[in-house]
A protein has these predicted regions:
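Structured beta-strand/turn binding interfaces of compact recognition modules in eukaryotic regulators
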Residues: 32, 43, 100, 111, ...
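Conserved helix-adjacent loop modules within structured domains
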Residues: 58-69
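The feature marks the first
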Residues: 1-60
């Protein structure tokens, strides 16, 4: 059986929601490309790994393909709600990140968590989100804010507010 790969190229209307149950958080990533709407769920461990991998990728990109990040284009995903009804396509086992220099796009690859129910081997489905650097950074920041917990956040840009406020790129 051939592996099913779903490409959202380019992925639009990204949304990341978090549902906390006791000490574990379940994340919901939703996006669309054209008429295809995809919803994935993943656990806190995958979220932490994704945020860390994002920063590692950005360290590499800064060295090999430097380009300033446009803070105004980073989506503030905290204010977005999922399209209802929510019907997750799959639960993510792991994420991978890639970069395509020709289009200056990052690729967020989600591999399905398979539970063995049959004797026939099945390849896990993959979903590839072709997104900008700013979109990927928005996902990582949303994950980090969800894991840190509530704190003062700038309503305009989503950055943490220090004791003396901060320089907001969106409102200045």
């Amino acid at each position: 059986m051939a592996q099913q790969i779903i490409d959202l190229n380019p992925a639009e209307q990204l949304m990341l929601d978090v549902h906390s149950a006791s000490d574990q958080a379940v994340f919901l990533l939703q996006s669309r490309a054209g008429e295809h709407e995809i919803t994935l769920t993943f656990d806190q461990a995958q979220a932490i790994a994704l945020a860390e991998a994002t920063h590692q990728l950005f360290d590499l990109l800064d060295k090999q393909y430097p380009r300033p990040i446009n803070e105004l284009e980073i989506p503030y995903l905290d204010r977005m709600s999922p399209q209802v009804p929510v019907r997750p396509l799959l639960h993510v086992a792991c994420f991978q990140l890639a970069y395509q220099a020709e289009n200056d796009r990052t690729v967020l690859i989600a591999a399905e968590l398979r539970r063995i129910r049959t004797l026939e081997p099945q390849e896990p489905r993959l979903v590839r989100f072709w997104i900008t650097r700013e979109q990927l950074l928005g996902i990582a920041r949303r994950i980090e804010r969800a894991l840190v917990g509530p704190g003062p956040i700038c309503p305009a840009c989503g950055q943490p507010l220090g004791p003396n406020g901060h320089y907001c790129v969106r409102s200045n």
